[in-house]
Amino acid sequence: MATKIRLKRQGKKFYAFYRVVVVDSRKKRDGKVIEEIGTYNPNTQPSTIQIKSDRAQYWLGVGAQPSEPVFKLLNITGDWQKYKGLEGAEGTLKTVEAGPDAEARIAAVENQAQKLKAAKAEAAAKAKAEAEAAAAAEEAPAEEAAEEAPAED
């Protein structure tokens, strides 16, 4: 059986991602596959390439021919160099640098929440103090008016 390692298209219009599959060369592009050996998502930065190296080595060893796009992916991951016994078997796959630690992000969010709570409490205390001052100011003129008025006997 003539086998090929090629891409099977998934996803929706204008947002395709692919599965790297081993398939009989006479089957349709998205037809029945023998084995799925990886995925490729060109929509992420950098592109996500995940290929099961041992399975790719096996299928290359038994004569499966990679398509041109899969050949390029195998070169990037270093699987083709391993199969051929060439230098550079570690591949040139780029990885996303790890962002800030999750715990650090959680701590930052909690710190910001504490600041917001403190600001709200301070604003509420200030509003309460102003309300009390206004109430005291209203009572003071009422008392002065009572003192100034002549007492009725």
From Swiss-Prot:
GO terms for biological process: translation. InterPro entries: Ribosomal_bS16, Ribosomal_bS16_CS, Ribosomal_bS16_dom_sf. One of its GO terms (molecular function) is structural constituent of ribosome. One of its GO terms (cellular component) is small ribosomal subunit. It holds the Pfam family Ribosomal_S16. Residues 121-153 are annotated as: Disordered. Belongs to the bacterial ribosomal protein bS16 family. This is Small ribosomal subunit protein bS16. It comes from Bifidobacterium longum (strain DJO10A).
